[in-house]
Amino acid sequence: MAEVRPVLAAASLARPKGERAAARREHWQKVAIAACEQCGRNRIPQVHALVPVEQYVLKENSSQKILLSPRAELRFSEACRTLGESLTLAAGPEAGFSAAEEAALLDCGFVPASLGPRVLRTETAALAALAALNALRGDF
């Protein structure tokens, strides 16, 4: 993982602004640094500032994108079969992205994929997807 780009969605519970948003970003950057130190990783992911989904899709230009969606027919493992070196992964808030936000992500080129029959918490879904991706790429 090279970057973390938090997005503000309609269903997002946390809505920090101003100094509070900057403090949260700094906190998560420190968490990323500590995690890298613990596991011996020499490249620290950059944690970006919080932006609305609508603003995020205007700047997203990755060639391969997966949107985690419990309603998707395509399984995550199938979506990852043709991956190159980089991938952008989108995990929504606890209640999911709104229909408009999901449409914007799909229009931006995200492919919806499911992690299976269980609906996972947002933080669990993102970690499960990253772990599955590492396993599929032979990192385990």
Language-model-detected regions and their locations in the chain:
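Acidic-residue sensor for enzyme active/binding pockets
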Residues: 3, 37, 94, 101-102, ...
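RNA substrate-binding interface of SAM-dependent RNA methyltransferases
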Residues: 1-66
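Active-site/ligand-binding-proximal alpha/beta "capping" segment
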Residues: 60-102, 110-113
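Short, glycine/charged-enriched secondary-structure capping and boundary segments
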Residues: 19-21, 80-83, 103-105, 128
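A short acidic, often aromatic-flanked loop/helix-cap motif at beta-alpha or helix-coil junctions
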Residues: 51-57, 73-75, 120
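Short, charged, surface-exposed secondary-structure boundary motifs
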Residues: 16, 76-79, 122-126
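Structured adenosyl-cofactor binding patch, chiefly the S-adenosyl-L-methionine
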Residues: 99-140
